[in-house]
From Swiss-Prot:
Superkingdom of source: Bacteria
Catalytically driven reaction(s): (4aS,6R)-4a-hydroxy-L-erythro-5,6,7,8-tetrahydrobiopterin = (6R)-L-erythro-6,7-dihydrobiopterin + H2O
Protein name: Putative pterin-4-alpha-carbinolamine dehydratase
Gene3D superfamilies according to UniProt: Transcriptional coactivator/pterin dehydratase
Family that this chain belongs to: Belongs to the pterin-4-alpha-carbinolamine dehydratase family.
Its EC number(s): 4.2.1.96
Organism: Vibrio cholerae serotype O1 (strain ATCC 39541 / Classical Ogawa 395 / O395)
Length: 109
């Protein structure tokens, strides 16, 4: 399972995932979407909560996860919602690390 894996170091020379690899890994996740923003493939999901405090607490859990994996998402915190977007900045696209971290986010809920 993806949430049991660890991220590997990803440098600018790393190779991004093919569309087929992205689709295969996406099939292992629940509720995540492949999007393109500014021409960059990204992985995104919105989590819903009963209030701002729960959403904030979840955002903090993701921040801890990001520090542990040394891989950092964009996090949008709103009342009752947290939108998490993963992509690998160094390769301007998706790497297996993004799918690993997405699965780890789901494991937090």
């Amino acid at each position: 399972m993806l949430d049991e894996l660890r991220c590997e170091a990803c440098s600018a020379g790393a190779i991004g995932l093919t569309s087929e690899e992205q689709q295969q890994l996406l099939s292992e996740l629940d509720g995540w979407a492949l999007i393109h923003r500014d021409g960059i493939a990204q992985l995104e999901k919105r989590y819903r909560f009963k209030n701002f405090k729960q959403a904030w607490a979840f955002s903090n859990q993701i921040a801890e996860l990001a520090e542990q994996e040394f891989h950092h998402p964009a996090i949008l915190l709103e009342w009752g919602n947290v939108t998490v977007t993963w992509w690998s900045h160094s390769i301007k696209g998706l790497h297996k690390n993004d799918f690993i971290c997405a699965a780890k986010c789901d494991a937090l809920t």
